[in-house]
Structure formats: C-alpha cells, structure tokens
Amino acid sequence: MNKKVIIVGGVAGGATTAARLRRLDENAEIILFERGKYISYANCGLPYHVGDVIPSREHLLLQTPESLKSRFNIDVRIQQEVTFIDRANKTVSVKNLATSQESVESYDTLVLATGSSPIIPNIPGIQSKYIFSLWTVDDADHIRQYIRQNKISDAIIIGGGFIGIEMTENLRRLGITVSLVEMLNQVMAPFDFEMAQLIHKTLEENGVSLYLGNGVTSFTETDESILVNLSDGKQLATRLVILSIGVKPNSELARSAGLALNARGGIVVDKTLRTSDPDIFAVGDVIEVEDFISKGKTMIPLAGPANKQGRIAAGNIAGENDQYPGTQGSAIVKIFDVCAANTGANEKTLLKNGLIKGKDYEKLIILQNSHAGYYPGASPMAIKLLFSTDGNKIFGAQIIGKEGVDKRIDTIGTAI
C-alpha cells in the first residue's frame, strides 16, 4: 500500500519537502495544503518587488500548483487551511477558505511547515490603516498599491532587522523619505555594536534618519496621517508605517494537537526532524533548532535552513536516516551599495553564553581591500573574526563592504 503524506504549508520548507519526497518515492500520495494563494515564492525578494527592483511579481513565484502537479505529481490545494490534527485517528480537518466547506483527510505521515508571522505588539493604535507589515506576496501587492495610489512621500520603518533594512533601501529607491526607529542602540542585531556603526553610517549617507534606542509607545491617528509616539517623547508623523520587529512561529495547530513546544512556541523536534509524535515531522520557521556553534536551542527563521530541513525530512519519510546538524545562521543583506554578512555567533552571544575574552575566545577586526590595491576599483571592507584562544575553532564572523563580502563569508562559514 502506498504511503500517504500530508504537508501543511508551502513556501520554503513545505514545497521543498514535497519535491524531494517525490524524487525519492514515485508511488507516495503527497498532498500539500496551503492556506494562502501561493505555494512557493521568494519571500526574501518581496522588499525588492515593493521597490520595483523586481517589477514583475511573477519573477518571485518559484512553483505554482500546476507546475508541482505536472512535474512532481503533487496534489496541491491552495486556500485550504488545516484547522485540527486528530493524532489518534491520524486525520486532519481542513477548511476551504474560498467556499467555507470543511473536510477530513487521513494521513500516514504528516509534515508541519506552517512557518511564521510578523509580531504585532499590543501597542495602542497598532490597528491603524496606515500601518503595514511585509511577509507575503499579498502584503507586497498591498504596500505597492498603497504607495502609488496615495503618492506617499515619506515613511517610518519600525525595526532594524533584515526586512526593515531592505524596505528602507527600497523605499528610498522610490524617492520616499525614510525614518528608521529601532528600540535597540543599533540596527541588525546579528552584528556586534562596532560593526553596526558602519551600517548606520551607510544608512545616514543615503538620507535615512535613525532613531536608535527608541521604542514606540503608541500610535495616534490624525485626519490625514498617523503620529508615531516614541519613548523619548518625540512624535513622528507619516502616512506609511512598516512594522518589522520580528516574527513568531505559527504553532497554533501543533499546540492544539498536544505536540511539544518550547517557551517561544517553537515546535520541538529531534535531529531527524520528528516531533514528539513520531508520525509527524516539522520543518522551517516553526521549529526549534540547535545552534551549530553553542549547541543550545534557538529559533532561526531563514529560508536556507528551511530548505535543508525539508530535504532531510523528506529523506527520513522515504526511509533514510538523515540528521539535521543544526543552524549556523549565515546571512547577507544588501544596504544600498554595501553588503553586510554574518555567520556563526557574534561576540554578544559568546559573552551571554559565559565565554571570557582572552580566556575562551579572541577577536580580530581588520580593514582590507576587496582585491589587490594596485588594481583599480578596490574598495575597503571590515572583517571581524571570533575564534578560540588556541586557534583551533572559529566561532563566527561579520563582514561589511562593497565587494567580495559574499565569497569571504562563504569561506569562513565552510571553515566553521
């Protein structure tokens, strides 16, 4: 009898699991449920679609229900939400969001790839029509349309993480004046403070107003705009606020099914990506992972690890015995004409974990050219390297520069 596998959620982890499983098992019945309209898209490209760097949304769509069906014989059901898991009878309850019709589907193996959602804090005025978040293709469409219809000339970004920084650049590209508000004393938390100063300098040189160490206490709507009230008493007025303060795992389905979760709501999995129920796997932003450096538990919502997890889960469903080694957290972001990349742990994390500089680790910060200085076009880059005092282990690295950042961070990441 052929195995029946149900996958809940598409995009990175779910779609990868489905495609890889089909390559390993030609006979399995594979059903993928996705509550949205799109099952596989480049979510990292959404800010660049808003900024018209990627003008066509079709370029963001990696797979469609039709392509997955024709190429991999996968039964894709979009706009259908799995609302309940009956672990005892190995069934899921499904609601068709277009027709409100409800149904029940059985499974042999279940994969949860429910992803994450933007954090919406409980701040007065947060539900304003002027406040947007960017996480899906529909979000990008909505923001693009709003900017054009309302001839937006200024905006406020709340949060200086990857999405906040990329949206800042892309709104400036559209000629929009941007203020960036960050509760911490720096943007880009994966970078240490001294390295983040180079990012601050780049942002300010490109006309971005920074409000660092400043939280938002409330939002107040006026007749034609919204006031962003900051913790230091300042008020900033605008007609467009982009909220990008982080994400939370979509683990409500797992919680209602009684699966083990961590304190942040992440699904607990073993090295084979099985949950506390051996017939249920989980991958992507929704799971707790092992930090590759510290070996502690953490949450790292990145597309690259989600894809790797999808491949490993598919292999194990097909009878292999692969293990996920943990997430290193390598990432890179473009900030106007500069690239900033990191891999492994930063110094803040080492100190938090009890390591002592000079005893447990050393750091090296150097400035070097992107290529030989005698050849025209070389540009400077800053490199911070964290390593054990005996020189046998690299803990992490951060690099900021205009050229050659990617290949250097790749090399260090591989060495780690």
Stretch-by-stretch model annotation:
Residues 1-11, 152-161:
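Beta1/beta-strand and adjacent pyrophosphate-binding region of the FAD-binding site
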Residues 2-75, 79, 119, 168-191, ...:
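Beta1-alpha1 glycine-rich phosphate/pyrophosphate-binding loop at the start
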Residues 2-4, 286-404:
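Mid-to-C-terminal Rossmann-like scaffold of FAD/NAD(P)H-dependent oxidoreductases
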Residues 105-115, 158, 236-246, 310, ...:
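Short hydrophobic core segments
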